[in-house]
Amino acid sequence: MPYFDPTPRIISQSLEELRFIFSWVKDHGETSQDPVTILIGGWAVDAYNPWYGSVDIDLVTNSRTKHSLKYALKNDRGYGTYEMWGESKSVSKQTDDGDIKEIIIDFISRELIKFQGNQTDFDFNIPMEQTAIKEIRGEVLAVVPKRSLLFLMKLKAAWDRTYRIRYNKCHNEDWERGKLVKDYADIIALIDPGHGGAELEIGFLGEKLNDYDFLKKCLENIPENLDAIRKYGRMSQHDVKDTIGQLLSLIG
């Protein structure tokens, strides 16, 4: 399996950072009825199907909250600026966890963001009706995208990562390949019929995958990634292939 194997300890540390973030968000006036900050990525997947968690924390928010929260993280939690793809939109905190040296908090703007290597836009200005309030590990209440939208976001993450690997755009290919395995495993977690996969909205996905037709190929590739299937560990390759085949058939 490509390198990316966090310990339970660093995932627990990440959960503690997540608790701080959403406590800060609540203390600064955000409400679930009018959310500004939305959790995406691996921790959002875990809110629907607790299977692994995450090291990094991915947040969609506005510019004002981003700057204020970054300031609080640097002053109260020991974070520093982290540059990703030449931009300093993220912050990171050093850990003492052997191989994985830091927890990264990535801030995504509420705007149109292109797929890498593609001129198609994905809208990260998430409407309130496409959000849900979920409890993570019985410890953190967070606003997350609805399962179907989160599924599309994870497909976008896998598409972008695959593009970076294929065209040598990544800083650390082994790390990227390991993260791609995690992306695929998260997608499997979202479609697993034994853990809420039936919640996926076929009409919504059909409309969106008509716009993002190229993502269907990304989805079709997942059953061939045995590392991802082993990492998720709750479905066989046959079941993953069958579930994805049924989903694509229903979407049309």
Question: Positions of the model-derived regions?
Answer:
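Compositionally biased terminal segments of proteins
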Residues: 1-252
